Each structure stands twice: as C-alpha cells, then as structure tokens.
Curated annotation (Swiss-Prot):
GO terms for molecular function: ADP binding; ATP binding; proton-transporting ATP synthase activity, rotational mechanism. This is ATP synthase subunit alpha. F-type ATPases have 2 components, CF(1) - the catalytic core - and CF(0) - the membrane proton channel. CF(1) has five subunits: alpha(3), beta(3), gamma(1), delta(1), epsilon(1). CF(0) has three main subunits: a(1), b(2) and c(9-12). The alpha and beta chains form an alternating ring which encloses part of the gamma chain. CF(1) is attached to CF(0) by a central stalk formed by the gamma and epsilon chains, while a peripheral stalk is formed by the delta and b chains. Transmembrane segments: none annotated. ATP binds at residues 172-179. One of its GO terms (cellular component) is proton-transporting ATP synthase complex. It catalyses: ATP + H2O + 4 H(+)(in) = ADP + phosphate + 5 H(+)(out). Belongs to the ATPase alpha/beta chains family. The gene is atpA. Its main location: membrane. It is an enzyme of class 7 (translocase). Pfam families: ATP-synt_ab (PF00006), ATP-synt_ab_C (PF00306), ATP-synt_ab_N (PF02874). It comes from Rhodococcus jostii (strain RHA1). The record marks 373 as: Required for activity.
Amino acid sequence: MAELTISSDEIRSAIENYTASYSPEASREEVGLVTDTSDGIAHVSGLPSAMANELLEFPGGILGVALNLDATEIGAVILGDYENIQEGQEVKRTGDVLSVPVGDAFLGRVINPLGQPIDGLGEIESNETRALELQAASVLERQPVEEPLQTGIKAIDAMTPIGRGQRQLVIGDRKTGKTAVCIDAILNQKANWETGDEKQQVRCIYVAIGQKGSTIAGVKAALEEQGAMEYTTIVAAPASDSAGFKWLAPYTGSAIGQHWMYQGKHVLVVFDDLTKQAEAYRAISLLLRRPPGREAYPGDVFYLHSRLLERSAKLSDALGGGSLTALPIIETKANDVSAYIPTNVISITDGQVFLESDLFNKGVRPAINVGISVSRVGGAAQTKGMKKVSGSLRLELAQFRELEAFSAFASDLDAASKAQLERGARLVELLKQDQYSPIPVEDQIVSIYLAGEGVFDSVPVGDVRRFEAELLDELHRTASGVYESIKGGKALDADNAKALVEATDKFKETFIASDGSRVVNEAEAEALDAGEVGHEQINVKRTTVSK
C-alpha cells in the first residue's frame, strides 16, 4: 500500500495561485429611491455624487436626466413612459451624459429625441455618438457667412437671402405657411444632392416639436414624394410625447447636424417650432419648482435657445469649411412679435422672415411681409446674378405697400403713383409661388430681371403667373445659351440681357391674356393684326401701355 504524502509547499502554492487569479464578480453602484413623481418629473433621494445632466436609469430601462441638484434630492426629467414610475422604486446612476448616435445611417429615417428609430424600418447601425450638450464653435473656429443657401423661394432668395451657416428665423401666426417655407427650402436642395459633390450637397434635418402625428406624417409623405427623404432626417417629438422629449428634440437634431458639419459637410436644420420647446421647458421648470419669471418662463429660457442656435456656424477652412444653417420657427399670437419668446429669438438670429396672416388670407403666398423681414447677412449670401437684379426689388415693394395703404383714402392719384401701384401689383403676383414648388435660381434671376425691365407692365395682373410660366418654358427653348451662362447664379451680361428681352418680345406677340387682349402696345397690336393674312379674323381688345 502506497504511502500518502502531503507537501505543505504544494498546498501553499495552490492557494496562492487561486487567490492571485481570483477576481470578485461585484460592482459598486450608487442607488437612490424615488420620493415622488408626477407629470414626467421624479424626485430622487440618495445619489449624492450625481452630475448635472447625468443620465439616470429607472426600473424597466427608462432613462431620466438629472436637472435639479438639491442638498438632499435630485429633480429628474423622465424620458419615456413615466406612468409606471412609482414612489420607492430604485434609481441608478449611469455615469454618462445624454448623447445620441450619429452618422449617415440616419439619412432617410424618422427617429425620436433619443436617436431611436420610430419608422418601422429596423434598427440604425451607428458606431459614433455625440453628446447633446457641447460647446459651440468659437469665434476663431468660424468664418464669415458668404456662401448662399438657395431656398427656391423668390421672395426670400431675392430680398432676405440665407447663407450657409446663418440662423434665419421664420416667424408668424399659426396657419400662415411657416412649415411650407422651410419644407420648400429642403426640397430645393435636391439638385445639389444629385451632383454627388459634398461641397454642394446639403444634408437636411427636420425637427418636429409638439406637432400632431398626422402633420409629421404629412411632411414625411411630401418629402418622400419629391425624393427628398434621401438626404433628410426627421427628429419627431409629437404632441403626445412627454415634455422632456419636446425639450430635447432640437438638441438631438443639432447634434446630428454638428457631426456632419465637423466632417466638412453642409447641413440645414429646421426647428418646427421653438415656441413649443419653450413651453415644454416652462412646464418642466415649474414642476421642478424653479422660480418663474416673465410669462411664467424660467430665468434661463433665453439660454435655452441661444446655446442651441449658436451651434449654427460656417467653420473655418482649417476645420473643413463645413456649415450648419438653422431655420428656427416661432409662432406668434395676433402678429405680436414683441412677446417674450419672439423677441428673444429675434435677438439671437441673423434675421427673420415674417409671415403675415392678412397677406396669407389675401392669397399672397408665401405671405412674406417685406417691411419687417430682414437678413443681417444680406447681399454677402447672394449670388452675383441675384444681387445684380434684385437690388431695387425690396424698395419697390415697400413703397408699393405704403402707397397702397395711402391710395385707399385718396380720391385721385397722379400718373406716377398709378404707374407705381400697377408695377407693384404685378411684382406681388410675380413673387407668389405654389407650395412645394421651389424655383431654380436661374429662373428667379430671369423673372426678376424682366420685371425690372417692365416686361410684365402690359400683362393683366391676373395673367402674370401664367405669363411667367409660359415665358420661362419658351426661354428654356429659345434662349438656352443665356441659361447656360448664368448657371449657378452668375451675373447677366449686356449681350445676354439683350437676348432675353428680344426673346421675350417675340413671345409677347403670341401671348393672349385671359380677357382676350394682347400684351403688346397699341401700335404693335395693329401691326400684328395687319400681318394676320389667311387667318380667321379675331376681334382683339388692345391694351394701351404708356412706356
């Protein structure tokens, strides 16, 4: 029988090896308790090390953001379904600040403010994230706004131009066409996208804040119909969402846009609308028992919007030269632009496009009030061709509005005033556009130039839009060389301008107004009638035009 021997050295070595390789499967967590909850706000005790804006995890994987850091408890906004959060439940720290996934995979998708897809098209694969609260580009990291961003809307591109990197406010009462103007600007980027050149392409982000779900679906359908979802991301926080989602949605949109901007790409972000974000933030602040100020808004509501809109920039060439252009929308009540939120955002932005309900109801659409709409970037954000032809347009329209108001009380007007009223009425017609029908910059330059030359003066006001549409179709055929020379917004030279006028004069000879009249002067009409040999006799009313 073998003798059993036990070596103390072997036992000691085995124990040492085991203890050296042992790693305890334990983690240290800070856990707090919900003390009370209501309307998407929870107060949590027992998390002394929590940071401002840190993500907290509630039962069921629901997230919250720590906003109030008091001595004994935390005030948190719940992001998601807050109805199942109850007093006494455990809350854990995550150690992370709120961030969203970013990248080209988001193009063509509809997401919520947490970056999660809500369009039923599957998960979005992205390996990169970006924090929602980041410092905007510094002064030295920027360059002046000089590159135009064409909206396809004649009244904006001619009189209140928008540049890449600008913040242009769209403001007006409800149902005045604010969303339609911004969607047109998105649709107009399709031609740039199809070039495949990243220096021309503009990626678009539409942020819907507090809109009806059906309205957001309508916007998505309009973008899909025109093929614009290919380069667009929709961040949706509909009216049914909690106040926390409505508060965060604009920051999510700008974070996704900033990612592309720092890659040297161009981005357009539409915030529709920031009034509802401010109202959501007011609700959150009041529930967190923060002291209210003017109109019950908290004291930092200005900072809410300024830190968001300051992220718009045209980066320096050293950082890639990318840009983030913002079109924030603000809803007014009874055209009152002096209310708290409108004045705040007007002071932050680089200009505003004011849409007036009276003009809208008169059929002037887009209903842009030329008098108080302004772009602080101005001609620097216009192409040479547009700058050359639109110089006097704004002044003429402003004078027309003033004279129109005066003429309502005047019994008799001199010939010059009548001529100015006639010209102004035709300019107003010329600037009207159908919804979702952006116009290429070349057509805009031609139309505005010919209007300045008096080509439309002999056209009845009711026929101006039909005359313009048929004229542009004809010029594309007969003056294609002119269009080629002004492609991309280049300036009209004297020879091309002369060719345009000559081609237009020929077209006018064939155009018949809806009342049967010719749009040429009396002598030209007589000559044309005399030359109609072998044709059926037509009784033509002649429009007398004083040139």
